């Protein structure tokens, strides 16, 4: 089941709540659109289509490693008291087009947008370590980029990651309520010279406050310890 199927399923689940807004994309992009879940998309930054050229004997273990890392990242991150009431709806799985995690708020106090941004940043941190380690050992690895959006904007975010996303970058496309959840924790910047309404609405993660980055570093280390223990086992 590839990423597009998962994304389509996510969108279908969400269509009903947006029918009242009319079918045009602009209404769906309304800054006050309601949301109680976010989608985190992780895609490989693979300019030369190297992944599909790899022999399955190399590609499949690499995708399995990425899947394992992402699932451990979700499990460890959601133990954080700050993210109480946020849960993962699916078990993410990497294929050539990346992976997709849907997080939902189980109550009105749960900071699901913050959880999405923290998960995206955490995976990018982990991926960079694995990437650098693999390259050092002359093994295959790719940099990644990530997008965090509400479910109404999953497709738009896929396009944004392709058109404006740079390697190791995180793009964010959320309604006001979501931006409000993350404002105190992260710095955001705008897309330079936007050419579409989505590019204009999109924000680029430009760093987190010390407390958040420290928290993420702790979770990253916990995930890497699990990884090392399993490798030795």
Give the role of each language-model region.
Residues 113-117, 121:
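Acidic, low-complexity cytosolic segments
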Residues 1-35, 160-233:
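Intrinsically disordered, glycine/charged-rich C-terminal tails and inter-domain linkers
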Residues 4-110:
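Catalytic NTP-binding/metal-coordinating core of nucleotidyl cyclase/transferase enzymes
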Residues 43-46, 145-152, 174-177:
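Structural motif
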């Amino acid at each position: 089941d590839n990423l597009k199927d998962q994304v389509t399923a996510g969108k279908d689940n969400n269509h009903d709540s947006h029918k009242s807004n009319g079918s045009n994309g602009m209404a769906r992009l309304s800054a006050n659109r309601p949301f109680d879940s976010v989608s985190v998309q992780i895609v490989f930054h693979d300019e030369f289509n190297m992944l599909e050229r790899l022999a399955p004997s190399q590609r499949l273990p690499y995708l399995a490693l990425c899947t394992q890392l992402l699932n451990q990242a979700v499990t460890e991150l959601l133990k954080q008291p700050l993210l109480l009431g946020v849960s993962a709806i699916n078990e993410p799985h990497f294929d050539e087009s990346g992976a997709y995690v849907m997080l939902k708020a189980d109550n009105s106090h749960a900071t699901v947008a913050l959880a999405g941004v923290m998960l995206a940043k955490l995976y990018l941190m982990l991926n960079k370590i694995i990437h650098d380690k693999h390259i050092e050992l002359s093994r295959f690895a790719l940099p990644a980029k990530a997008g965090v959006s509400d479910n109404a904007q999953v497709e738009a975010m896929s396009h944004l990651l392709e058109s404006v996303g740079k390697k190791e970058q995180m793009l964010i496309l959320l309604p006001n309520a979501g931006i409000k959840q993350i404002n105190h924790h992260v710095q955001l910047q705008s897309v330079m010279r936007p050419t579409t309404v989505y590019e204009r609405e999109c924000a680029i993660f430009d760093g987190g406050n010390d407390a958040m980055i420290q928290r993420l570093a702790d979770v990253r280390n916990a995930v890497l310890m699990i990884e090392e223990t399993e490798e030795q086992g």
